[in-house]
Amino acid sequence: RAVDKHEGTADCSPCVGEDTLYASIIKDQLAGIQLAYAAYQQDPVEPESAHALRVAIRQLRALLNFNKANGEEKYYREAGEDWREIATTFGYLRELDVLMEECRELRGLYPEMLAEDGQVMTWLMEERQGEQDSIQELITSGALTERILDAEAATDQFLKTIQLDDAQQKKATIKKLEKMKKRLMRKWEEVDFSNHEQTHSLRINAKKLRYASTYLAPILGEKDKDTIKEMKKVQTALGTLCDLDINGHLLLEMADKTDDPDLQHHFRKLSEHQFQRREAMLNDEAD
């Protein structure tokens, strides 16, 4: 397994970091990323492939972030930046997939404009193919795989610097989860839902809390089902608002990218539709 490739052999005592429940959870997560990366290479056309890989990386980053204060910052930062860069490689591909899914759902409203073989969908599929080809070059050259191995090595180094045994980790985890919950609830009260940055940031925090509550359950001895359920609800509600905003701006960028006046018109019309739907959701929220 590539996960073990960069494992250090240096003698390290007391080595609390590597033999803990937390370390085994992180190593499982690393194995999950390897599986998702292999699955993407098997079927890059399937929208779920890139999405699953990004989610696996996001989960790992949330779990590393959870112990940020308890290990060496240098390795934490290195691992975090590496993993973020890898996830970002698949970011535009994911945005295109979300947008195409939305277009297919809107086909009832605009049957001609959004026909599968029509101008809009053809343009989007060609754009996606181009992006997929760019990613394929990174894979074929070995650059992306090397980046993943570097990220794994930094993650392993970070684990070695965490000097908490399981009992200490349990205590720290309970404390941190409480703190995260309080902070999130405070932010929820203060958030301006019409502000994309604030909404997006709150959604990320809800995901972090959900992932931590889910995957750190072995440390706590049980799953905090209420928190997980609550955060899933927050995430879903904010997700639609965020997607509509991203889609709207993406469509405007596409209108600027093409010289075809018909396509420009279609993209702008669809963009307007996304922003109007977002507005309607915000008005519902206000009522």
Named regions from a protein language model:
Residues R1-D287:
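Function-determining surface determinants
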